[in-house]
Curated annotation (Swiss-Prot):
Membrane spanning residue stretches: none
Any GO MF annotation of the entry: DNA binding
Function, as annotated: This protein is one of the two subunits of integration host factor, a specific DNA-binding protein that functions in genetic recombination as well as in transcriptional and translational control.
GO BP term, example: DNA recombination
PANTHER family, per database record: DNA-BINDING PROTEIN HU (PTHR33175), INTEGRATION HOST FACTOR SUBUNIT BETA (PTHR33175:SF5)
Upper classification of the organism: Bacteria, Pseudomonadati, Pseudomonadota, Gammaproteobacteria, Alteromonadales
Keyword Nucleotide-binding found: no
Organism: Shewanella oneidensis (strain ATCC 700550 / JCM 31522 / CIP 106686 / LMG 19005 / NCIMB 14063 / MR-1)
Entry protein name: Integration host factor subunit beta
Length: 95
């Protein structure tokens, strides 16, 4: 599901809100989440999951085109850990 699809689905389900209002709310929510992670804080949405930063240590990688070694710096990357309710719902899916 893309952001546009999410906006459309929420606007359809919440008929009292316009698509523009839903779009604004989603953009603001995502902006607040990004700002929180930028400041190094953790985000927890009970039942859904948590977002945090994990440190990736410096390492030697490879350039896929040339095969040559490349030194990669250490960095923080966003990490999502699903909550219990979300894990249980996904586990129950028979694909």
């Amino acid at each position: 599901m893309t952001k546009s699809e999410l906006i459309e689905k929420l606007a359809t389900r919440q008929s009292q809100l316009s698509a523009k209002e839903v779009e604004g709310a989603i953009k603001e929510m995502l902006e607040q989440m990004a700002t929180t992670l930028e400041s190094g804080d953790r985000i927890e949405i009970r039942g859904f999951g948590s977002f945090s930063l994990h440190y990736r240590a410096p390492r030697t990688g490879r350039n896929p085109k040339t095969g040559s070694s490349v030194e990669l710096e250490g960095k923080y990357v966003p990490h999502f850990k699903p909550g219990k309710e979300l894990r249980e719902r996904v586990d129950a899916v028979n694909v």
